[in-house]
């Protein structure tokens, strides 16, 4: 057990003071929280500094805070911003640690069973451990999370009970410490020293915490007493600091013990017996045989190894939960009086609601056809009503709050004025005929003045074709799509801001929270095609991407003006009028937001070759003379042709794209 520090305070560090309507928003939200208001809405137009406002609120109310975001890109962006605002506090990041995840599934129509397949990102796993350990150690914690936070995580009480606490002068046998480390899933490896491992040299035990990747701990014994504890650089072994006390958290969030495991196995075997009788009585002999074979194998693995592939399907027994009871999640690691902030709530809350149903439908097939026991259905995300039961106090943040939030509270705080005096962008509607040539002209105007462009399309095919077309014209362009891995999207947004390319094409990824002040033009293709991506809320969000630049403008390419288009244009005009009046009254001249480009979370290099091309562009090409650059392009073209001759078309295509980018870079 560890002693949690509850007297820390949030220390907001910023060169700016709240301006515009930020002060009244901060005051109203803070007063609402302090008076016990359970749910509030911050209706903040794009670029009005909602993150800064909520940071001020967090600092004033001093509660552990969960920031819930609807995707990893935005979560990564928010993580960087909050880390900058609170450098002296624990700002953590908690998203799914899978680079790739194929869930277990069964398709009856084709009798196809799909095994679970996944690739875990070690960096994100480290950050997840850092988040949970911080929540148990201190109160000044902000966790920026995706909806991964409502998925099963393991019992926080078991996790905390297994923490190994070490102090200088403490009497403990060295071998007892080693056994404790093994119990909390640490591996001994005296050669390959990594997270979640320890190594032993005589009376010295070095432990690499699961929540760190830079510093390890060196515990020095004198007999059966801890003589000294030192924090060391894991790579060089240099001493960083002396420590009087350390808490070693488990290397996994799913902790158990022999008694729990024994009880769980009994429960699994009892359920298997009952389920086999049901299936046999229903004449489902194949399903019964399949279930018996698979479950018996899992039970044998649990008995012998304490682990089996797919152990999460038995989590109900491991946690000691009753049928239907919700699983433990990140929310259970927070104290009861925590503050929840839902970013882009109009998207996040429907996503939270949909998680349970999608998971249930897939697992029900596995249960019905004898691949899993019915208890596997309890390895699931939380239902919306279960999330609501965890909520102590919540602030929903959005420029366009959804019906869920608006139905739950009338306490709406508006924030329309931007601190920089920036106005909502101007909007033009232009005909679809000749739209691409028109768009090329507009792009070139922006490139000449070092500004960026967002283009949003309706289909992946159109986005890809448009990207290829622009590349052929020598325009530096990238395509942001759903196949891009976890945090590589954040890298792309950062590269756009750095000017490594000028145009970003996307489908529905260029709406909420993508924060690029350098973007002065947003082009919306097929704006008159009513639907999810072109409704009023989506259009307002997309328009908002141009609201951080003093030259911000939006062009909608459409042959008719739909009701959604008109409503979005009317709301934008209303806000623009309010903003212009405020600027006139206070003699403010709008200026583009000057925002530092933050460093990336270290996990952006998620695969073996992720970012190789970008690394090449960054480290070598920019430093070459023009003659060297042309020579490099020539060599790459030769490699491209060689790859094509060998029928390695994937490599050839990668080299082709690189050559096109390099040619555009020097043109």
UniProtKB/Swiss-Prot annotation:
Q: Which CDD domains match?
A: DEXHc_UvrB, SF2_C_UvrB
Which of UniProt's keywords are assigned here?
Answer: ATP-binding, Cytoplasm, DNA damage, DNA excision, DNA repair, Excision nuclease, Nucleotide-binding, SOS response
Q: Which stretches make up the UVR domain?
A: 630-665
Give the highest taxon in the source lineage.
Bacteria
Motif Beta-hairpin: positions: 97-120
Q: Where is the Helicase ATP-binding domain?
A: 31-414
Query: For the Helicase C-terminal domain, which residue ranges apply?
Result: 435-597
Does the record carry ATP-binding as a key word? yes
A GO CC annotation recorded here is: cytoplasm
Principal localization reads: cytoplasm
Q: Which PANTHER family match?
A: UVRABC SYSTEM PROTEIN B
Give the function comment from the record.
The UvrABC repair system catalyzes the recognition and processing of DNA lesions. A damage recognition complex composed of 2 UvrA and 2 UvrB subunits scans DNA for abnormalities. Upon binding of the UvrA(2)B(2) complex to a putative damaged site, the DNA wraps around one UvrB monomer. DNA wrap is dependent on ATP binding by UvrB and probably causes local melting of the DNA helix, facilitating insertion of UvrB beta-hairpin between the DNA strands. Then UvrB probes one DNA strand for the presence of a lesion.
The UniProt subunit note reads as follows: Forms a heterotetramer with UvrA during the search for lesions. Interacts with UvrC in an incision complex.
**What's the record's remark on domains?**
The beta-hairpin motif is involved in DNA binding.
| Name of the protein in its database record | UvrABC system protein B
- Origin organism is Lactiplantibacillus plantarum (strain ATCC BAA-793 / NCIMB 8826 / WCFS1) (Lactobacillus plantarum)
């Amino acid at each position: 057990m560890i002693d949690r520090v509850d007297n820390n305070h949030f220390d907001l560090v910023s060169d700016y003071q709240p301006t515009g309507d930020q002060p009244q928003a901060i005051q109203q939200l803070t007063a609402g929280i302090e008076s016990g208001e359970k749910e509030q809405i911050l209706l903040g137009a794009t670029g009005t500094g909602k993150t800064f406002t909520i940071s001020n609120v967090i600092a004033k109310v001093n509660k552990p805070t969960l920031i819930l975001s609807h995707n990893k890109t935005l979560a990564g962006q928010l993580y960087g911003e909050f880390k900058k605002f609170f450098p002296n506090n624990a700002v953590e990041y908690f998203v799914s640690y899978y680079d790739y995840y194929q869930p277990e599934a069964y398709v009856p129509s084709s009798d196809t069973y799909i095994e679970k397949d996944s690739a875990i990102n070690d960096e994100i796993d480290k950050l997840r451990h850092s988040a949970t350990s911080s929540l148990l150690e201190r109160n000044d914690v902000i966790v920026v999370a995706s909806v991964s936070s409502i998925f099963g995580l393991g019992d926080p009480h078991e996790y905390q009970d297994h923490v190994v606490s070490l102090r200088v002068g403490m009497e403990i046998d060295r071998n007892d410490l080693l056994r404790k480390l093994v119990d909390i899933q640490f591996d001994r490896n005296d050669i390959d020293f990594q997270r979640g491992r320890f190594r032993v040299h005589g009376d010295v035990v070095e432990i690499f915490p699961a929540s760190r990747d830079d510093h390890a701990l060196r515990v020095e014994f004198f007999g059966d007493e801890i003589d000294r504890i030192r924090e060391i650089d894991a790579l060089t072994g240099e001493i960083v600091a002396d420590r009087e006390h350390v808490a070693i958290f488990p290397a996994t969030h799913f902790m158990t013990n022999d008694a729990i495991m024994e009880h769980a196995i009994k429960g699994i075997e009892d359920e298997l017996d009952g389920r086999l009788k049901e299936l046999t009585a229903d004449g489902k002999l194949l399903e019964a045989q399949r279930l018996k074979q698979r479950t018996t194998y899992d039970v044998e693995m649990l008995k012998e190894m304490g682990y089996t592939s797919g152990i999460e399907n038995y989590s109900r027994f491991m946690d000691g939960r009753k049928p239907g009871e919700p699983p433990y999640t990140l929310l259970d690691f927070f104290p009861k009086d925590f503050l929840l902030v839902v970013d882009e709530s109009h998207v996040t809350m429907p996503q939270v609601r949909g998680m349970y149903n999608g998971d249930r439908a897939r697992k029900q097939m596995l249960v019905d056809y004898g691949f899993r026991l019915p208890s596997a259905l309890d390895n699931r995300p939380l239902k919306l009503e279960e999330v609501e039961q965890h909520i102590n106090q919540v602030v929903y943040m959005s420029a366009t709050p959804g019906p869920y939030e608006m139905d739950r509270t009338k306490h709406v705080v508006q924030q329309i004025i931007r601190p920089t005096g920036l106005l909502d962008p101007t909007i033009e509607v232009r005909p679809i005929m000749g739209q691409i040539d028109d768009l090329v002209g507009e792009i070139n105007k922006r490139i000449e003045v070092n500004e960026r462009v967002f283009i949003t399309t309706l289909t992946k095919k159109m986005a890809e074709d448009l990207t290829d077309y622009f590349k052929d014209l020598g325009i530096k362009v990238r395509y942001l799509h759903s196949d891009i891995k976890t945090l590589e999207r954040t890298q792309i947004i950062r590269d756009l801001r750095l000017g490594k390319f000028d145009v970003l094409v996307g489908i529905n990824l260029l709406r909420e929270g993508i924060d690029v002040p350098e973007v002065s033009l947003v082009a919306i293709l097929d704006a008159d095609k009513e639907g999810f991506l072109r409704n009023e809320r989506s259009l307002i969000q997309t328009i908002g991407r141009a609201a951080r630049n003093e030259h911000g403008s939006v062009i909608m390419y459409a042959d008719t003006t739909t009701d959604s288009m008109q409503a979005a244009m009317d709301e934008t005009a209303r806000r623009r009028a309010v903003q212009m009046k405020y600027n006139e009254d206070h003699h403010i001249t709008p200026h583009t937001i000057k925002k530092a480009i933050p460093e990336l979370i270290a996990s952006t290099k998620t695969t073996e070759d992720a970012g190789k091309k970008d690394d090449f562009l960054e480290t070598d090409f920019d430093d070459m003379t023009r003659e060297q650059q042309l020579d490099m392009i020539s060599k790459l073209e030769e490699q491209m042709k060689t790859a094509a001759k060998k029928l390695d078309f994937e490599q050839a295509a990668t080299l082709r794209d690189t050559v096109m980018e390099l040619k555009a870079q020097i043109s």
